[in-house]
């Protein structure tokens, strides 16, 4: 993607930092998350160039900082190759290796895999005033220690939900995760009779308690109340869940 811009010479813009999505990128990561079992020496991540031009790809893992770069990230992983050229219609397998740093043994740890795509320079273009766009995709990496109690699939239904009133007077869903696994979810809503009140969704870490606001709920419901959401499993699939809710 190229745009005329006076006074600029091949400026690389990290468009992902400003809300651009993976769908805008030619490079597609196979899968929406990486599960790294602690007993494995390495795991493999496949990326594909679905565009019509060659691209240069740089990959690294961070600890959740969107502003991270390969030079300042302290995540305990090494990626091989860290930089590669991928031709149109081709793919690249990346080896992700844990360096052995001290991490909790009783719960998962979460990191982020970054894949930065830089399009090839236009050949034969005499105009130096070109803004060259680079796209960054990020997916979660879950480092999973051996011998954790339970499974990631079981953790989904073990979430403990409450409907609470915040000090501001607004209602919210409170979710407590008593397990050793992260639970990611979307399409979160409160179900009261025939009414459905949507809420923001997100990830709930091991042992964590998180609030999800219900700005459209004005009165405390009566009768049976449930919480509904789509949990995201290890394969990136959405699992529909409906659980009873404590008032």
What spans do the regions from the language model cover?
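Asparagine-centered strand-capping/turn motif at beta-strand->loop junctions
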Residues: 47-51, 173-179
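Beta-sheet-dominated interaction scaffolds and their linkers
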Residues: 25-48, 151-168
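Short, solvent-exposed loop/turn segments enriched in Ser/Thr/Gly
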Residues: 38-44, 106-110, 169-171, 225
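N-terminal targeting signals for Sec/Tat export/insertion, comprising classic cleavable signal peptides
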Residues: 32-70
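Short, hydrophobic/aromatic beta-strand segments
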Residues: 53-61, 182-188, 241
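Terminal connector regions
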Residues: 99-148, 220-247
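Intrinsically disordered, low-complexity Pro/Gly/Ser/Thr-rich segments with frequent PxxP/GP/PP motifs
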Residues: 69-101, 194-221
């Amino acid at each position: 993607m190229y745009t005329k811009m006076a006074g600029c010479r091949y400026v690389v813009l990290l468009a992902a930092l400003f809300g651009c999505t993976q769908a805008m990128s030619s490079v597609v990561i196979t899968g929406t998350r990486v599960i790294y079992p602690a007993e494995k020496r390495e795991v493999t991540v496949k990326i594909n160039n679905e565009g019509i031009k060659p691209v240069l790809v740089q990959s690294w893992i961070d600890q959740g900082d969107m502003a991270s770069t390969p030079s300042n990230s302290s995540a305990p992983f090494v990626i091989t190759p860290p930089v590669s050229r991928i031709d149109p219609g081709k793919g690249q397998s990346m080896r992700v290796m844990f360096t052995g740093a001290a991490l909790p043994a009783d719960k998962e740890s979460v990191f982020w895999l970054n894949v930065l795509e830089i399009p090839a320079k236009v050949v034969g273009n005499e105009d130096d005033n070109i803004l060259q766009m680079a796209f960054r995709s990020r997916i979660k990496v879950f480092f999973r220690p051996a011998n954790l109690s339970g499974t990631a699939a079981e953790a989904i239904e073990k979430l403990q939900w409450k409907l609470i009133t915040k000090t501001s007077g607004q209602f919210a869903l409170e979710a407590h995760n008593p397990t050793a696994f992260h639970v990611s979810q979307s399409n979160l809503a409160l179900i009261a009779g025939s009414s459905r009140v949507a809420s923001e969704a997100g990830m709930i870490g091991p042992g964590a308690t998180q609030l999800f606001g219900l700005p459209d709920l004005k009165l405390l419901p009566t009768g049976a109340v449930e919480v509904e959401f789509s949990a995201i499993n290890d394969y990136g699939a959405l699992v529909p869940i409906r659980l009873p809710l404590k008032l």
